[in-house]
């Protein structure tokens, strides 16, 4: 039984899942929206929301925390340029997931996750 086991495993090991989340977060910050599977979009959404909440206040500590999650200085700089101005007065709800329908090859449910 999976009682009290939070989060989705996505059929990957811990390291692979962590790298997947990091890459999805970097791509989302750089491109403002990405097309991925619905399961991946739902899994990475809370991570991105927490990262943007950290980036709302531009302090050295917040930058270090964001860099530890992103591991990309360019993405971190970009996040800290738009997050305080865009999301300064908003408490959560920074992303939107839109369903796109099944993928042609394998029928996986696709989704568009974007920064609002």
Curated annotation (Swiss-Prot):
GO biological process, one term: translation
Pfam families xref list: Ribosomal_L17
Swiss-Prot/TrEMBL keywords: Ribonucleoprotein, Ribosomal protein
MF annotations from Gene Ontology: structural constituent of ribosome
GO cellular component: cytosolic large ribosomal subunit
Highest taxon listed in the record's lineage: Bacteria
Subunit record text: Part of the 50S ribosomal subunit. Contacts protein L32.
Similarity field: Belongs to the bacterial ribosomal protein bL17 family.
Protein name: Large ribosomal subunit protein bL17
Organism expressing this protein natively: Chloroflexus aurantiacus (strain ATCC 29366 / DSM 635 / J-10-fl)
Lineage: Bacteria, Bacillati, Chloroflexota, Chloroflexia, Chloroflexales
């Amino acid at each position: 039984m999976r009682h009290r086991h939070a989060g989705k495993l996505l059929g990957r090991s811990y390291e692979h899942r962590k790298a997947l989340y990091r890459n999805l977060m970097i791509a989302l910050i750089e491109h403002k929206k990405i097309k991925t599977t619905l399961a991946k979009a739902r899994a990475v959404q809370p991570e991105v929301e927490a990262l943007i909440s950290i980036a709302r206040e531009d302090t050295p500590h917040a930058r270090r925390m964001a860099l530890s999650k992103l591991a990309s200085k360019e993405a971190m700089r970009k996040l800290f340029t738009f997050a305080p101005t865009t999301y300064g007065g908003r408490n959560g709800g920074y992303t939107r997931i839109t369903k796109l329908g099944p993928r042609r090859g394998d029928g996986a449910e696709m989704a568009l996750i974007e920064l609002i």
